[in-house]
Amino acid sequence: MTVIYFVLAALALGFLILIHELGHLLAAKAVGMTVESFSIGFGPALVRKKMGSIEYRIGAIPFGGYVRIKGMDRNDKEISEDREKTVYDIPGGFFSKSPWKRIFVLAAGPLANILVALFAFGILYFSGGRTKPFSEHTSIVGWAHPSLEQKGLRPGDRIFLCNGQVYSGNKMAFSSSLLDRKLSLQGEHPAYFSEAESFSLDVPFNPSLEGVPCLGASYLLYRGSEPLPEKSPLIDAGLSEGDRLVWMDGALVFSGVQVSQILNEKKAFLRIERQGKIVFVRQSRVLAGDLQLTSYFKNELIDCQYEAGLKGKWASLYMLPYIINSDGFVESKINLLNTDQQSLDYHLELGDRIVAVDGIPVMSNADILRLVQDHRVSLIFQRMSSGQLSVLDQKAADKAFIDSYDMDDLLRVAGSVGEEREVSHLGEYRLVTRVQPKPWVHIYSEELLDKQRALASKFRDEQEKRYYLERIESEKQRISLGIPLKDLAVQYNPAPLVLMGESISDSLRTVKALGSGRLSPQWLSGPVGIVRILHTGWSMGIPEALSWIGLISINLAVLNLLPIPVLDGGYILLCLWESVSRRRLNMRLIEKGLVPFMILLILFFVFLTLQDLSRVFIG
């Protein structure tokens, strides 16, 4: 099937080039110009056939195509035979027509691409659109980069505007920050636990240096079609198909990345009595050897270690960065030895009493010390109905997501964590406590990483190869729940003109960012890369392929309309100047000026092709 998809991808790209050149051909014939040749590709002809006065060719270099119209250059045979003639004097020639007719012919190619895009988007719309993961186009945040979280963007927030445009998902946040080197966001903190509150933030952000700014929220569903690994910490949790993970250690969870972050943060989930009220906090667990401990407290810690039945050196024990008395009351905080290398957030207050650690009730500081050596998580799953699991229209999906919580029941279940009698079931919610997560490698087979290692070993750069191999090894040790969490599908079907507008806007912003130096050419693709993209689209189904065909067709139109010599837009600019100035063009001067631009364009396409090939063969 891969070969078939590759052939379909190559044919799709060839079709878009064909349509572009066909637009020029039909327009030229319509205004009475004489067309000499019609070629798909440049260089020596692999196939040629003359039909009437036009020679049709397929060139050896698949970088585009051209329509050769009589009299387009000074080397035309009629000019060579008569030195007094100019390109303007050739009957049926390109320059024999008025500037506006020439502009019509030049614009016909990009216009044909725009019509193809509109047609592709129209078919997509009237066939029902595409089925996409909810996370891909939601305005709800599933995870936020730490720099954005510090500015107030949190998982679960809803974004309305991104850099002045209506927000359409995390891909928009990435592209906007890539092109503008900043993010200006407006949205709201939805009413999950309290009243909804508006927010806005404006922060510099460069994804080339900082990575992905945010991810979309996901439903985190256990579908049941993929069984749990035998060594999964949740193997005996009694999960059923359609169960959704909604809460973990005191927080609503909105994405797999957020779940992984909570699992790997080395924090304990504490139930606290504070001034007669129950509060929950997540507090860092710190190695005792990293804290400023007096000799007296070291001896106290060793006594507590003995009482808790813990072996090993006291410095290798995890503890909370506080002095806690035998009844579990917080007496004071303990500072780090080296504050330059790390910092701590202190969430406990003087007089707080710790009554449970990771959902397990405690009676003494020895119980606390014993339990903070490992991290057990408390989880709440929501039993989703068949109606809630059905495919929704993307426009209604965000509201359905926010409305899917019964916060009264959820808060009652969550508030019971650490009580002697927990509320294990209430309504559609079920509490699962004392789950012991494990390193990934202790749950799954290491053979699953062999493919990633093989890809990393292909890198020619030794430093880059070592980086990726080390990253694979570190990922093995990441703490995991051992559960495949899937997203809910939504029907994504914007109107054709909306897709057209977004595509044109993105293309123009990309050109602007390239020209200003904010965007590196490494983010671009040439013919090989476009075929790979179309190959991926075909492999995902006809709707996805239609979407990419429309998008690439729009990009071809925008590219050709750029006011750069040798492109359609450059010639249009010359014709406009001729029309305004009422003076004929100096073709000798123009042809000399075109040479460096032609060389630069060829070098640019060669660079993109080599870059695409390196992605294929190196990674």
Curated annotation (Swiss-Prot):
Pfam families the UniProt entry points to: Peptidase_M50
GO CC terms in record: plasma membrane
Known cofactor(s): Zn(2+)
Q: Which domain of life is it from?
A: Bacteria
InterPro entries membership: Pept_M50_Zn, Peptidase_M50
Query: What are the binding positions for Zn(2+) in this chain?
Result: H20, H24
**Cellular location(s):** Cell inner membrane
Q: Name one GO molecular function term.
A: metalloendopeptidase activity
- The UniProt record lists the EC number as 3.4.24.-
Quote the catalytic residue positions: E21
Keywords for this protein: Cell inner membrane, Cell membrane, Hydrolase, Membrane, Metal-binding, Metalloprotease, Protease, Transmembrane, Transmembrane helix, Zinc
Q: Which protein family is it in?
A: Belongs to the peptidase M50B family.
What protein is this chain from?
A: Putative zinc metalloprotease TC_0344
In its UniProt entry, the species of origin is given as Chlamydia muridarum (strain MoPn / Nigg)
